[in-house]
Amino acid sequence: MKLHELKIKRKYYDDVLRGKKTFELRKNDRDYREGDLITFKVIDEEPPKEFNDCFIRAFKEPYIVFRIMYVLKDVPEYGLDKDYCILGIRQLKE
């Protein structure tokens, strides 16, 4: 089991926290597997003017962990590129 720390835009993170968004479309470059864990770092969509690169804001939010429940990959006949996967995720309860 691995722990993956992923970047996520604020608008998607809010939906994940509310349980409205229970999946993630990701580039399949980390060998995701069922049972792996995910945490998220929220990124700003618009970096501050003084920065050229993507800016990661440190939010004082609870450290929340999600478990990968399902990995959908290798189905180009349904329009999912071979380099991407869809992760079914569920928040771990404390």
Where are these regions (language model features)?
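Catalytic phosphate/metal-binding cores of nucleic-acid and nucleotide-processing enzymes, i.e., regions
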Residues: 1-94
